[in-house]
């Protein structure tokens, strides 16, 4: 997983509420265990429509998706963040993410950014009026910068640490190996394990 600190990207808007994981990537793609190429399957059932936003030339190279409320609802599938990342998205902005999707996204290095409804409406409007908008994301300070506006967003400390350092949960534990061994050694010396 690549570390995330700050990045700049263009954003595209997909202002549809309740986009579920089957719409993000249909179940027929879940047999694949290789992330490569999944970006081509992102929203595949909608990509047949010529007017779909991700089919437009201006959407190519977009790194931020501005989505509607309740993004990623439905069944758990790690393939959903994989497909979003495969297309090139580094972050998704919404007012709410389904818990399972949010967890899968964070564990795979995709940043789910939660904003309030008026902010989402404003960003969506700006994006639709201009096709794309330029966005700067600063994870360290938990801020998004758009058109001279600074928007703060919440993220839990553990997820933030993992994203900043480019590690998943296992990588985090492995990085603590020396401290864990030192604790175990000192703990074993203090605890009587005879008869245990």
Curated annotation (Swiss-Prot):
Record function comment: Catalyzes the isomerization between 2-isopropylmalate and 3-isopropylmalate, via the formation of 2-isopropylmaleate.
UniProt pathway annotation: Amino-acid biosynthesis; L-leucine biosynthesis; L-leucine from 3-methyl-2-oxobutanoate: step 2/4
Name of the protein described by the UniProt record: 3-isopropylmalate dehydratase small subunit
Self-association state and partner proteins as the record states: Heterodimer of LeuC and LeuD.
Database matches in PANTHER family: 3-ISOPROPYLMALATE DEHYDRATASE SMALL SUBUNIT (PTHR43345:SF5), 3-ISOPROPYLMALATE DEHYDRATASE SMALL SUBUNIT 2-RELATED-RELATED (PTHR43345)
A Pfam family per the record: Aconitase_C
InterPro entries on file: 3-IsopropMal_deHydase_ssu, Aconitase/3IPM_dehydase_swvl, AconitaseA/IPMdHydase_ssu_swvl, IPMI_Swivel, LeuD
GO BP annotations listed: L-leucine biosynthetic process
Any one Gene Ontology molecular-function term assigned to this protein's record: 3-isopropylmalate dehydratase activity
Family statement: Belongs to the LeuD family. LeuD type 1 subfamily.
Keyword Lyase among record annotations: yes
E.C. code: 4.2.1.33
Reactions catalysed: (2R,3S)-3-isopropylmalate = (2S)-2-isopropylmalate
EC primary class: lyase
Gene3D superfamilies: Aconitase, domain 4 (3.20.19.10)
Keywords annotated in UniProt: Amino-acid biosynthesis, Branched-chain amino acid biosynthesis, Leucine biosynthesis, Lyase
Top-level taxon: Bacteria
Example of a GO cellular component annotation carried by this entry: 3-isopropylmalate dehydratase complex
SUPFAM superfamilies linked: LeuD/IlvD-like (SSF52016)
């Amino acid at each position: 997983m690549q570390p995330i600190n700050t990045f700049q990207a263009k954003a595209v808007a997909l202002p549809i509420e309740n986009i579920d994981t089957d719409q993000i990537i249909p179940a027929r793609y879940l047999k694949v265990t290789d992330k490569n190429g999944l970006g081509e399957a992102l929203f595949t059932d909608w990509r047949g429509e010529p007017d779909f936003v991700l089919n437009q030339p201006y959407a190519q190279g977009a790194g931020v998706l501005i989505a509607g409320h309740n993004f990623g609802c439905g069944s758990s599938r790690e393939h959903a963040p994989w497909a979003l990342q495969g297309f090139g998205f580094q972050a998704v902005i919404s007012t709410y993410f389904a818990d399972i999707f949010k967890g899968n996204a964070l564990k795979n290095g995709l940043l789910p950014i939660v904003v309030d409804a008026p902010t989402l409406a404003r960003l969506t409007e700006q994006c639709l009026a201009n096709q794309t908008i330029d966005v700067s994301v600063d994870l360290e300070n938990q801020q998004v910068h758009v058109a001279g506006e600074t928007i703060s967003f919440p993220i839990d400390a553990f997820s933030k640490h993992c994203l900043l350092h480019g590690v998943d949960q296992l990588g985090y534990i492995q990085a603590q190996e020396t401290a864990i061994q030192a604790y175990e050694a000192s703990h074993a010396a203090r605890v009587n394990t005879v008869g245990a």
